[in-house]
Amino acid sequence: MKYHIHKAVVIGSGTMGAAIAAHLANAGVPVTLLDILPKDAPPDDREARNKIVNDGWERCLKARPANLMSPELKTLVKLGNLEDDFGVVAEADWVCEAIVENLKIKQKLMARIDEVRKPNGIVSTNTSGIPVSAIAEGRSKEFRKHFLGTHFFNPPRYLKLLEIIPTKDTDKDSVEFFSWFGEYRLGKGVVLCKDTPNFIGNRVAFGTGAFAMDYILKNGYTVDEVDAITGPLIGRPKTATFRLIDLVGLDVWDHVGRNLAPLIPHDKLGQEYLKAEAPAKLMSTLLERKWLGNKTKVGFYKEVRGEDGKREFWSLDLNTLEHVPPTKLRFDSVKAAKDVEGLGDRLKVLLEADDKAANLVKALTYQSFQYASSIIPEVADTVKPIDDAVRWGFMHQAGPFETWDMLGVRETVKRMKAAGYPAARWVNEMLKAGIESFYQYQRSSPTDKRRAPRSGIADKNGEKVGVYDVVKGKYIKLRKPEGAILLKQQKVVSQNSGATIRDIGDGVACLEFHTKMNALDEDIMNMADEAFNRLETNFEGLVIGNEAENFSAGANLFMMVVGAQQGMWDMLDAAVRKLQNLNMRMRYSPKPIVVAPAGLALGGGCEITMHASRVVAAAETYIGLVELGAGVIPAGGGTKEMLRRTVNPFMRLENAEPLVTLQRAFLQMGQAKVATSAEEARGMNILTSADRIVLNRDHLLSEAKKEVLHMVASGYKPPAPEMIYAAGRDALAAIRIGAWMFQEGNYITQYDHHIAGKLAYVMCGGELTRGQWVSEAYILDLEREAILSLFGEERTQARMWNILQTGKPLRN
């Protein structure tokens, strides 16, 4: 390969630079982070000379959510300064500049890099507002061939968007390679951008955000009202509008908006709202007060302690500029829309209503369509880069044109015009030509009898195969993602309301869950049983995975708590046995079963993962045995499996004592600890060294299938049955004493202590007089006995109901 990236350098240790370096470490790329020398730094004091970069990296390590997927990854990051350590630039395969947004300073740095850059070494800038081509002015031809913009969104670990901006001089091979590197190594959604002001993501965000702020102030909306309306209800994150500005920082938001306005004199729609008087006056006042948002702990929201000592977030009164307690909001349109599942159908309910909330949704929706269409073909020739940038950069459920397709383009254009937000001319020309949608769609698998996915696009559920090209005036073919499997396009083998078995080709099947939060219920268990049966005769291997936000949030608590309160003990016993049996069947399957978790994999979802032949996990997998928070213990084989992984290896050593490793596993389950990444899950013995981690979620199922095929080709054999070391009553007594001390110190409640005692009993093998090796079935029986007894306790039932009603654990 002409290009590779084995070593990288990031210059600039501010918020973005340090976070980019951290994400390179997440991807396994050794990186050196450089910054300037402090003024008057002594020549022989390394610590003093590296103070700026050391401080920047320290802030990065302390940031929450964490920039690194595991603390151990920091060993991949070296620190230095631009005088003593500039030599590393000559060895780097990629140099990423993330310094102050000043053209002259950037150009001066590029001149230094040009002198030492290695042949085929790629150089990029993370600028968000300066023309990329201007930064490379005056540089050598070879430098300019290997120079481009790489605009990450903050924080780089969590936001998928990477805008790549080539100049007219950038070599095509450099662009293709870095696009591949961004997608496959860094796990990014890559959008190729023209070198236009603020590229695509921020151009759309500030063109629509400036309008939103002006409309909100003119029409007397409160901060609470706006954020209640403009979050998940309309397909946007919980940060909605004002929480997002607090997160970004009011100073950053204002700076980007002010810098954008003079760069787009031709953009009348953007100019009108970026220069609006009321928002400018508000922002100026808040900046004078140093109310910058989360970084100063006060902005549009302020954290206060209520009379009961609990945290509350008070919102800013936009008239008095004082923070006020939160208020409960009631809008008929919002109440009606909340009961509707699909985003398109939910928006239709809001757009057809006529109250204050509905009017805000109409204005924001129609203006976003108007503005996004107005900047084509300036920023892109098709709608897809804009949709991708909005989804990946701002975590919207759908981009503006995907949303427009949901609502029906022709009908929406009429409504927009009537509301005073006319669509761009090219949209009307498209409709005149008889083209009714921005995308061409291919129907889903005809054998799929399920309704549209909850997160899907209403009436447009097929795969996108084409997109309207504004310049050419016709659909052009969309490139099929090479590293992705789209389940809805795969043949359905069998299906019920909880799960589907699909044939994903090459002798591999996929078991897909699709209950709410993918909670494990009887339908999923039955379909899993069928999948294992079909695997024996019809397939070479099986993937268990899905395309939902979360792999599985665990067992169906509603079924469990209702069953307990109605005394349905046979049903509960059968349900627990079935999960245990399925997991054991999976562990000893003669054919490989690869589990592909992503998002939440909690409780039973974690237990399924731990019994796989192998795991191929998305990097952003949040996994753990959390049952104690619901008033029970892991009983689908999770307790048994944790003992096998933590205690067994240690007890095979000579003169080993089990207590230390046993206590570590006990605390992990007792505290219901959740790994904050797949990498961290490895350190918790939930994933093993043989399991794989995939940074790009879109590639997860494809990589899981590849793993199945590799295991088949390698002659996969299941593991031999294994005995479990049970430490006996002496270890049980020691753990019980530790739990009692936690209770006495008010770290846990009396009922926490009671549940912990049940867990300890199972982990130690009950009241065995001495430590001994026991069968897996012995521990599974203890798991089942413990959970059934806990189901019958009122305080466990109260914990379950609280999670169902509030989503939060109850400490009773």
PLM ranges: what are they?
Residues 1-542, 546-549, 557-591, 598-602, ...:
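N-terminal glycine-rich phosphate-binding loop for ADP-containing cofactors
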Residues 606:
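Short glycine/serine-rich donor-binding loops of glycosyltransferases
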